[in-house]
């Protein structure tokens, strides 16, 4: 966790897994503290992805100013660099208005950016990308080993995407993985100018599973299938991150004949539970020390943060 600092603007970050209840508690806290909300949900960026993302309703958005919601067409993929730039702009503008900022979301990699570096400064040329792309997976691993005589450390060589990324950066920088890792650790995070503190909202797993089931039923009743039908001609499948999102990918499978209608709700529930498990692990292992709050026993939004 960032050390407390009196010369940095305070930044509160509220994280939590899917269906835990972040939206309502964030709204209550923001209303009580004259704050504005900066979304840290990788799917709320996209216009039209409303039902399947449990996007705040028009009424909820009207209660508190929100940032980074509905900022991209569905075919325009957001990435970490774009998110960081947009979030920094939003935070700077909020501070200039003399208001508090509350970052809210469950997208682990984006959340991590508020507490440390998430991207290195290595620029990979098109020529290097083409050179690596021409290699078979086995050849890529072998080339990477040649460039790293001390070894590959904890790199998962069975993951082609990670091997490609590592090899591209070694070739582009002329450095070993160990050297790149050491340089990365010395980088300041993109939000080092803020004193960020984290609270993770959680619930008992049995209760959370019940909320997931209710949420899926409500989404289907609200017209999730029709939402996906509208988004497909708008370019949903051109954006893999959006098309693979839980709720959307299952409906796509339904519409393309790979999933029977009778199995739709159960499939979305199953995949949501798996996502929640991954989110919990990420929050525990990848985010800094934080305060954990049980949403089921929380009575006042003031109890979310201790500073």
Curated annotation (Swiss-Prot):
The record marks 107 as: Interaction with substrate tRNA. This is tRNA dimethylallyltransferase. Keywords: ATP-binding, Magnesium, Nucleotide-binding, Transferase, tRNA processing. Pfam families: IPPT (PF01715). GO terms for molecular function: ATP binding; tRNA dimethylallyltransferase activity. It comes from Opitutus terrae (strain DSM 11246 / JCM 15787 / PB90-1). The gene is miaA. It catalyses: adenosine(37) in tRNA + dimethylallyl diphosphate = N(6)-dimethylallyladenosine(37) in tRNA + diphosphate. Its cofactor is Mg(2+). Monomer. It comes from the Bacteria. Belongs to the IPP transferase family. ATP binds at residues 16-23. Its EC number is 2.5.1.75. Residues 41-44 are annotated as: Interaction with substrate tRNA. Catalyzes the transfer of a dimethylallyl group onto the adenine at position 37 in tRNAs that read codons beginning with uridine, leading to the formation of N6-(dimethylallyl)adenosine (i(6)A). Substrate binds at residues 18-23. One of its GO terms (biological process) is tRNA modification.
């Amino acid at each position: 966790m960032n050390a407390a600092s009196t010369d940095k603007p305070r930044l509160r970050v509220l994280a939590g897994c899917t269906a835990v209840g972040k939206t309502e508690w964030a709204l209550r806290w923001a209303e009580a503290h004259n704050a504005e909300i900066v979304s840290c949900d990788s799917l709320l960026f996209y216009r039209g992805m409303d039902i399947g993302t449990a996007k705040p309703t028009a009424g909820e958005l009207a209660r508190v100013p929100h940032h980074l919601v509905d900022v991209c067409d569905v075919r325009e993929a957001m990435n970490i660099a774009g998110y960081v730039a947009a979030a920094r702009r939003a935070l700077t503008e909020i501070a200039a208005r003399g208001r508090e900022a509350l970052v809210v979301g469950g997208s682990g990699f984006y959340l991590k950016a508020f507490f440390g570096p998430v991207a290195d400064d290595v620029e990979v040329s098109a020529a290097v990308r083409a050179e690596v792309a021409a290699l078979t997976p086995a050849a890529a691993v072998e080339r990477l080993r040649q460039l790293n005589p001390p070894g590959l450390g904890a790199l998962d060589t069975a993951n082609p995407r990670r091997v490609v990324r590592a090899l591209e950066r070694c070739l582009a920088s002329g450095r070993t993985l160990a050297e790149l890792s050491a340089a990365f650790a010395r980088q300041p995070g993109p939000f080092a100018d803020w004193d960020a503190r984290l609270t993770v909202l959680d619930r008992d797993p049995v209760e959370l599973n019940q909320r997931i089931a209710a949420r899926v039923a409500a989404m289907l009743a609200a017209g999730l299938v029709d939402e996906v039908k509208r988004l497909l001609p708008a370019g949903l499948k051109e954006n893999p991150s959006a098309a693979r999102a839980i709720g959307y990918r299952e409906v796509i499978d339904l519409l393309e004949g790979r999933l029977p209608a009778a199995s739709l709700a159960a499939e979305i529930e199953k995949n949501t539970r798996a996502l929640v498990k991954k989110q919990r692990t990420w929050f525990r292992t990848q985010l800094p020390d934080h305060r954990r709050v049980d949403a089921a026993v929380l009575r006042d939004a003031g109890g979310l943060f201790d500073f």
